[in-house]
């Protein structure tokens, strides 16, 4: 301590007791200064020695107490009591009658109201202080170094004294246990074994780590904390030699693995893509590359699946996936734009590894992921037809796999746009479906084969993919290669040039049945693989058919069918062969479990009538094919095998069609029964009488109502129209009880039948006017019906 530290109003006062014999302070040479309460303050020598001359009379204890009180009021009153030479080896004692403890910046200080003397240490206990006039005061010195404890003395009431413990050195140890949050939510503790703490002269604490651990500390002035990004665990990433490219000047790379990843991003492995890993609302974007012949590289990323997003990093044939999701670069982006940077770079040298912990300063904010890309020869892509031998030769090329996700209203499309840079950096951002309907890709010059896979969802949720591979691309200008994908379910690849490949949707799978392609009259000649029907050839049979305005033709030619189908659609979209329109007659009852995307071949009927080959072996074209129920005691006859199978489900009690209306849950054996039941919930009456404004929910009710009009007019009439049944169609269903057509005219292309009055009602409901005649004649069907 210096004198300036104790230049205050009240300083520490130490009274040096004097003795004559010289043996009164022999025991005061301990490690610390002994603090005790003084018993004598006379001007002469101590009365305990008994040997000196010139002694004054010893005051009484009451006088001593009065003198002590007077020293508190007047500090210079008893300055003459410290006269006389002090003996060498005398013990320094502190008068703690009115002592106060004060905590300063450098420790505890003992403050007394007396200023006659100062505290002395044990090294200066033999030196005398000449205080004849009482005005001198020695320098303030610190007590010898040691740990101080607070000890309570019995003589001092409610006061505490700092007592120095001799022989104890200050040694402070700290144990630093950092806690990190792992990906699965558990706490991970790293114990710093054998860590020692040292304090240098500048007051900074240095932590010496144990074996195999590194703890970053701050040696500068001030206790700054390392500003790390939230929810990030910084790790060192081993890097290997990459392909045949040349790295830039940087030699240190860092990866930041996020614990929580915002946004709906799913990385799919290209070798195990199945329908289970794809959902209609998922956004898939995967880029894999195969370049050098190095193998055995491991994925360097790992993530955890959370409720709002999932990050799946997998390895396809020892090839790694690398993304940078939702990181904020130097450019200004909005909240709904997730920038994804894909970087591929490498060197032609041997596989060298380096571990750094350098922090990337350009990244700010959470949910960032920067990972460099290793290129291996084992990265095979699904749908790729390239052999392994070709992959080993094309070391400088890349395979780009683009999987456009199935989007719904309000969701975003992922647009990949490649900039012509040396490192082949791909940047993508989320664009709304309303602003961008297509997916455009600009390939880089000398790039590898590009594989485009378009998803298609069937009626039962099964996902099928269409693969398009483009090879040997030589891009001269940045806008030469443009690939446009339309986000439609029913997609067909058209014949276009090599520079522009366009996928054009032909029809939507929701509006047409499976296996049926709806085209206009102008598209019949341009579409390959479709059979066209020359309606003028039907003039030999005395029938003339004209296409109605605004009514396209629906042509279905499926392998296994016995005849082509020709249908006329009305303006309201309610076709003649629609399942909901004519389902009650049982003409279009589909199988209980239809296959998605394809139609199965018709199964051979096992009824007794077909087994005897009497029905199918008959050469009579006017005879209908019949199918008889083999259940004993039933014997019902049907014209279609699907009707017979639906009837057999009625026998077995199987009801695969269930109503999904709230609190209903009824099940039915046929789909037309389910459609008819749903109209009871909605109250829809789609069958209208052509002669009166009455409407009905069921077609059989309408047919009964039409009979009332026919009875008033004097008999039923017969009309001729174009039916939608194939050549093997026959009678109605079991429940309708309608009569079979009275006449059937068969041609090689279509089936013309004379229908019953309820068929007339169906045609009238669909917007087609049919003229009724009493006998079979040539009829011109036009827009106005006449």
Swiss-Prot record:
PROSITE patterns: ZINC_FINGER_C2H2_1, ZINC_FINGER_C2H2_2. There is a cross-link at residue 15 (Glycyl lysine isopeptide (Lys-Gly) (interchain with G-Cter in SUMO)). Transmembrane segments: none annotated. InterPro entries: Znf_C2H2_sf, Znf_C2H2_type. Pfam families: zf-C2H2 (PF00096). Coiled coil: none annotated. GO terms for biological process: cellular response to estrogen stimulus; cellular response to insulin stimulus; cellular response to wortmannin; cellular response to zinc ion starvation; definitive hemopoiesis; embryonic camera-type eye morphogenesis; embryonic placenta development; embryonic process involved in female pregnancy. Residues 36-48, 73-86, 125-137, 343-358, 372-397 have a biased composition (Low complexity). One of its GO terms (cellular component) is cytoplasm. A zinc finger (C2H2-type) spans 627-656, 657-686, 687-714. The 9aaTAD motif is a transactivation domain present in a large number of yeast and animal transcription factors. Interacts with ATF7IP, ATF7IP2, BAHD1, POGZ, HCFC1, AATF and PHC2. Interacts with SV40 VP2/3 proteins. Interacts with SV40 major capsid protein VP1; this interaction leads to a cooperativity between the 2 proteins in DNA binding. Interacts with HLTF; the interaction may be required for basal transcriptional activity of HLTF. Interacts (deacetylated form) with EP300; the interaction enhances gene expression. Interacts with HDAC1 and JUN. Interacts with ELF1; the interaction is inhibited by glycosylation of SP1. Interaction with NFYA; the interaction is inhibited by glycosylation of SP1. This is Transcription factor Sp1.
